[in-house]
Design a protein with these regions (language model features):
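Short, contiguous strand/loop micro-motifs
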Residues: 12-13, 23, 51-53
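Conserved beta-strand edge residues that scaffold enzyme active sites
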Residues: 43, 82-83
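N-terminal flexible/basic segments that precede or flank functional cores
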Residues: 1-20, 83-94
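Recognition helix of helix-turn-helix/homeodomain-like DNA-binding domains
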Residues: 44-58
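DNA major-groove recognition helix of helix-turn-helix/homeodomain DNA-binding modules
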Residues: 63-79
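Short N-terminal alpha-helical targeting/association segments
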Residues: 21, 44-46, 71
Length: 94
C-alpha cells in the first residue's frame, strides 16, 4: 500500500464520538490520497462500509475499525481524557 506513514505521524486526532472518529478516518484517508474503494479493498471491506464508518452511521464492529486503521497504517491508542469537559455537539451523538 502506498500510505506515507511518516507523513501520517504528524496528525494526531482525539475523538469522543462515532461521528468524530469517522471524520478522523476520512481525513487520514484523504491525506493518504486513497479513495473509499481503494481503502475498502486494502481493509478487506466494501466501499459502502467505509462510507458508513466515515459518516459515523449505525453500529460498526470493532474489528472493522481495526481493519480500517491497519489499512491506513494507524493504531488505536487509549488514554485518559484531557479534561472532563464534553467537547462535542448533540448531533454528533444522535
Amino acid at each position: 500500500m502506498a500510505t506515507n506513514h511518516k507523513k501520517q505521524k504528524d496528525l494526531i486526532i482525539a475523538t469522543r464520538a462515532a461521528g468524530q472518529l469517522g471524520q478522523a478516518i476520512e481525513r487520514y484517508r484523504a491525506r493518504a490520497k486513497l479513495t473509499q474503494a481503494s481503502l475498502a479493498k486494502s481493509a478487506g471491506l466494501r466501499q459502502a462500509t467505509i462510507s458508513k464508518v466515515e459518516k459515523g452511521m449505525g453500529t460498526t464492529e470493532i474489528e472493522t475499525i481495526y481493519a480500517v486503521c491497519a489499512a491506513l497504517g494507524l493504531e488505536v491508542v487509549l488514554r485518559p481524557r484531557q479534561s472532563e469537559k464534553v467537547d462535542f455537539r448533540p448531533e454528533d451523538i444522535f
